[in-house]
């Protein structure tokens, strides 16, 4: 029987799940439970040509897992009869010591709970998903795959913050980086697409989704990335601020009377594109820029301009770090689907060797493709990320 892996990605209010054949790369089923804990919870699963949906309230992550398993049964893909060999879990933060795909036991779950302060939006729901899945599949191996793993060996100059070194060492403060599974997968796919050795390429990878990060990759090894100790640093994101002067936080605490928890919530949930433009969906943002009322239009335009400005700054910085860049890759929801973001991120860079083909950039596609002009010294690609497949393949290597 063909072996399969169930991959779980537990968010703060959602559970994504996918059943994959790691050997062939085929996705057998793909689903999501959304708005966990709300009255408007919904769940859906696509399995082959069948789509199954549910709309009843899902109170917590354990219930979300039960809902997911029920969807598989309803779609005729009972998890007990599909050759399931492992369950893979995306875990955002592995801290200083966890940077390899790791078999999950009770001690590891306790360790992941202790790392919650480093990724408060991501690690706690991952632990909930792990606990529920281990209860549902006690006889299967469960494997944690860490977002931070790919960036574990960043050069010291990139990983080190210029703060008191004793404090950094005592509290393991460094640039950890995130979306590592995606950055690694996409950079490897770029080499395959171009049919050249990964070791020969210098790349800038732009993972632009609700969370967003950039990386500079030389010969298959990352030399810098935009996210830091936590997933809040770097690019402007859907609800996260990205780079911000630390003095702003001290000012808000000391002068505005905000608590640490209030500041953290503001930075994570009420900042970024939503904080400036009131919306995280770029399709809506573009609509407001084109046809919203004056206030909505101005706010949306500012949010978009700040987003693009920050993105261009990081691209420029990484061009300087790499010296020369063979490939720039766009991936994730915004990177794969928003032609305007790609155009504006790279406009005016012809003298730096980066030229887009307007027609190719505007042409939608769900497969890897080149969008740079034939005359462009730097190749620009759009490559769909597939973190779930990368996690599934990491699982079978461990077990």
Swiss-Prot record:
Binding annotation for Mg(2+): 9, 387
GO molecular function: acetate kinase activity; ATP binding; magnesium ion binding
UniProt key word Magnesium: yes
EC primary class: transferase
Site (Transition state stabilizer): 179, 240
Highest taxon of the lineage: Bacteria
Annotated positions binding ATP: 16, 207-211, 281-283, 333-337
Gene3D superfamilies per the UniProt record, alphabetical: 3.30.420.40
Annotated positions binding substrate: 90
Keywords, alphabetical: ATP-binding, Cytoplasm, Kinase, Magnesium, Metal-binding, Nucleotide-binding, Transferase
Subcellular location: Cytoplasm
Cofactor binding mode and count: Mg(2+). Can also accept Mn(2+).
GO BP terms, alphabetized: acetate metabolic process; acetyl-CoA biosynthetic process
UniProt EC number: 2.7.2.1
Gene Ontology cellular component list: cytoplasm
Pathway involvement of the protein, from the record: Metabolic intermediate biosynthesis; acetyl-CoA biosynthesis; acetyl-CoA from acetate: step 1/2
Listed InterPro entries: Ac/propionate_kinase, Aliphatic_acid_kin_short-chain, Aliphatic_acid_kinase_CS, ATPase_NBD
Catalytic residues in the record: 147 (proton donor/acceptor)
SUPFAM superfamilies, per database record: Actin-like ATPase domain
Family recorded in the similarity comment: Belongs to the acetokinase family.
Quaternary data: Homodimer.
NCBIfam families per the UniProt record, alphabetical: ackA
HAMAP family per record: Acetate_kinase
Biological function: Catalyzes the formation of acetyl phosphate from acetate and ATP. Can also catalyze the reverse reaction.
Protein name: Acetate kinase
Organism whose genome encodes this protein: Mycobacterium sp. (strain JLS)
The organism's taxonomic lineage, starting at the top: Bacteria, Bacillati, Actinomycetota, Actinomycetes, Mycobacteriales
Originating gene: ackA
């Amino acid at each position: 029987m063909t072996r399969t892996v169930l991959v779980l990605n537990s968010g703060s209010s959602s559970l994504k799940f996918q059943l994959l054949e790691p050997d062939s790369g085929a996705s057998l089923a793909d689903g999501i439970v959304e708005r966990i804990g709300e009255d408007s919870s919904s769940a859906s699963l696509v399995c082959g040509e069948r789509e199954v949906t549910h709309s009843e309230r899902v109170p917590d992550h354990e219930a979300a897992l039960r809902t997911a398993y029920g969807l598989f049964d309803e779609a005729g893909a009972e998890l007990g009869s599909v050759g399931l060999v492992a369950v893979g879990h995306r875990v955002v933060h592995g801290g200083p010591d966890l940077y390899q795909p790791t078999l999950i036991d009770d001690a590891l779950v306790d360790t992941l709970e202790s790392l919650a302060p480093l990724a408060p939006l991501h690690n706690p729901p991952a632990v909930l998903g792990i606990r529920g899945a281990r209860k549902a599949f006690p006889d299967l191996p469960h494997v944690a795959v860490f977002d931070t793993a790919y960036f574990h060996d960043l050069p010291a100059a990139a990983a080190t913050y210029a703060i008191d070194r004793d404090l950094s060492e005592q509290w393991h403060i460094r640039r950890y980086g995130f979306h590592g599974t995606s950055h690694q997968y996409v950079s490897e796919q770029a080499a395959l697409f171009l049919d050249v050795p990964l070791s020969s390429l210098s790349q800038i990878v732009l993972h632009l989704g609700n969370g967003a990060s950039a990386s500079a990759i030389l010969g298959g090894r990352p030399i810098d990335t935009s996210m830091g100790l936590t997933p809040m640093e770097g690019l402007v994101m859907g609800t996260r601020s990205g780079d911000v002067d630390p003095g702003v936080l001290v000012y808000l605490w000391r002068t505005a009377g905000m608590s640490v928890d209030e500041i953290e919530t503001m930075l994570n949930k009420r900042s970024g594109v939503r904080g400036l433009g009131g919306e995280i969906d770029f399709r809506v943002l573009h609509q407001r820029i084109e046809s919203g009322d004056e206030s909505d239009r101005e706010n949306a335009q500012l949010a978009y301009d700040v987003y693009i400005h920050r993105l261009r700054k990081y691209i420029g910085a990484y061009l300087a770090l790499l010296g020369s860049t063979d490939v720039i890759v766009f991936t994730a929801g915004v990177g794969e689907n928003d032609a305007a973001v790609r155009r504006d991120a790279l406009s005016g860079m012809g003298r730096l060797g980066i030229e887009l083909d307007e027609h190719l950039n505007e042409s939608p596609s769900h497969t890897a493709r080149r969008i740079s002009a034939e005359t462009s010294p730097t190749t620009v690609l759009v490559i769909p990320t597939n973190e779930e497949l990368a996690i599934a393949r990491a699982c079978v290597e461990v077990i």
